[in-house]
């Protein structure tokens, strides 16, 4: 049995850990609310943009549309793997990387050119041994994501070199459910998990005048904007999932520390009682010998 001093020190250490996990849980909850608000605004924007492109695509010549979207060429891929810079969020980082590995390895096995961009240092640390280093193009910090930063990144990479752009990220469903998914953001598709269908409304009942009067130019511009907006929205989805996963992980840690403290308190009291009983027996035995 451990000594009273050892038990007391262990209880003190666990209480210190409990304070930290409680604070982290509260911070994650606050960040989750902020992430959800940003995500809601982003979904509204990308859903409206998606609706406009859908309407233009209906009125465009199919051969022209195929040329704009590069539908017939799938040789060059750019893949974004979005996770976190930090841990303490359960299997959040590893699940996204593991999910992406299977899909990426299939592309590489079929002799496709694949470049990978990691968002999050933990994602890179988890994935660097799973992929060939020659396929890793960049590693980006997942903190402080803004639309301007995403626009600069997209411009720096030059997405025109790639026929397909895919994003692996953790989709936020609710506080207790986040799921790794794959989203193709180039070429544009009428089906997307990033949009909110409740705010998408068809625009085909209206008559529009385009300026400039060149539907090819307009569609190219809008689909490029859509790629940037989609990547930004996926990053916000991932941030919400990360904060939710960390909040749940810290809540679980708090429960575990409470259980440990209860067990240690019981053990401490029993040890203390045993020590007092032993002292009393020794005192009584000494008195009787006198």
Swiss-Prot record:
Q: Specify whether Transcription is a keyword of the entry.
A: no
- A Gene Ontology biological process term: proton motive force-driven plasma membrane ATP synthesis
Question: Mainly localized where?
Answer: membrane
Write out the annotated subcellular location: Cell membrane
Membrane topology of the entry: Peripheral membrane protein
User: Which Gene Ontology MF annotations are present?
Assistant: ATP binding; proton-transporting ATP synthase activity, rotational mechanism
* Pfam families linked to this entry: ATP-synt
A single GO CC term for this protein reads: plasma membrane
The record lists its disulfide bonds as none
Q: What keywords does the record list, in alphabetical order?
A: ATP synthesis, Cell membrane, CF(1), Hydrogen ion transport, Ion transport, Membrane, Transport
Keyword Ion transport: yes or no?
A: yes
**UniProt xrefs under InterPro entries:** ATP_synth_F1_ATPase_gsu (IPR035968), ATP_synth_F1_gsu (IPR000131)
Subunit field text: F-type ATPases have 2 components, CF(1) - the catalytic core - and CF(0) - the membrane proton channel. CF(1) has five subunits: alpha(3), beta(3), gamma(1), delta(1), epsilon(1). CF(0) has three main subunits: a, b and c.
Reported function: Produces ATP from ADP in the presence of a proton gradient across the membrane. The gamma chain is believed to be important in regulating ATPase activity and the flow of protons through the CF(0) complex.
Q: Which HAMAP family match?
A: ATP_synth_gamma_bact (MF_00815)
Q: Which family does it belong to?
A: Belongs to the ATPase gamma chain family.
Q: What is this protein called?
A: ATP synthase gamma chain
Gene field: atpG
